[in-house]
Amino acid sequence: MAEEMEETHCMALNVENFKACAKIHNHVKNYLKKGLVQIVGFETEPVFQIMATACDGGILVFKVLNPFESFNVSYSRMETLSLSFKNQPHGNTYLYSKDLFGEAVKGASLTFLQRPGLCRPDFVRSDVLMDDDVTTSSHCTSLTSWSPPAHDIRAGTVMSKVVLSIKTCTMLQKWLKDQKSKGEPRCVRLCLNEILSVLVLSVGEASKTVHLKPVEGNPATSLLFADKQGDVCIISDDEAHDVSLDSLLAALGVCRIPALCLPCFNFHSNGVLEVVGLQFKSSKPASGELSVFLLRANPQVDFNGVPEGDVQTQEVSSVASTCRHLSESCSLDPPRTPELPGSPDTFKEIPGRSGSVHLERDLSCSDSEEETPKQKPAKAKPAAAPKRSEKRKREGGKKGPKAKSLKLTFNPLI
């Protein structure tokens, strides 16, 4: 079957540049496992990159600079390339990136094949030669039928740039993890203010402010290296983005590699927020680029909340909440019907020891103690609590005459 195929593209990889990017690959290999290997761009300057998802709202792009030593096109000549295949094929444990970024690799090549009579490649074959000049590996898989437009995401120009320090990055990662553990909304709002030079991150009612040091320059061509101390920025306009909390947390972890790079926020003119791994000045220049594109997330709407400034809505909601509270309290404690002092229901039967039944009046609410709504004052001040002895005398004086006037005794023996 392999003999019947026609070679369309054949490329020899620059092994040294792939080895130089091995540290970045090992840092993000868990994300790249389910990603796509892409060869895009012009045929004169092809780009090798691996694209994967960063949680639910981010796109991770790992690019290798100067990836090929030679690039030949036999059939299907096109002005632009768009070749994609899975890093881990279906039903297999083989990983292309593991072989291509290996430290013991001496030579590697990729060959794209097509069926006779067709004008597009259908399969890709990788050939890897190890340092011992004996061990070789070869693997063939089919191409994907579609190619995501990953090269079109960075279409806009960089309008603002924010470079974080090690201390600030650690603080933000810890704060986002705390908000995630609290079960807060999964949406984070990033607000960038030009006048105050601050970056505000808010999750629900919690917020965190990062004070930045503004510098002069063009955001697209300045701040090309990260600094371990201090948070610097170039802001041309105010920005506000709603992104996924998990994706932002993953982007900060992906773009922070010890002794190599720190996260940098790039705000593009087309509304795209990009987190880039910006390399240190003192570190050896790597032959790769690492970035995470954060997609816009719709903030969770609280339908029970009340927008600020809408007084009528606030009043209606307050009345509704009061009525709901009253209905709940009434369902738990049903209202009692008022009892008249002269009605037979106000007498209680108290069984006596000698077999007689005593009838006494309920004195819990007397006529003198009841007040009509007109008699109640507008605001009653709490009176001082009387002493225990005076309270007993007053209660004893009230109960004395009433108990004498209502002595009703019935002896069934007589």
UniProtKB/Swiss-Prot annotation:
The keyword Transcription regulation does not apply. Keywords: DNA replication. One of its GO terms (biological process) is DNA replication. Residues 327-414 are annotated as: Disordered. InterPro entries: DNA_pol_proc_fac_herpes. The keyword Transit peptide does not apply. Residues 389-405 have a biased composition (Basic residues). Belongs to the herpesviridae DNA polymerase accessory subunit family. Increases the processivity of the viral polymerase, probably by acting as a sliding clamp that prevents dissociation of the polymerase from the active template. This is DNA polymerase processivity factor.
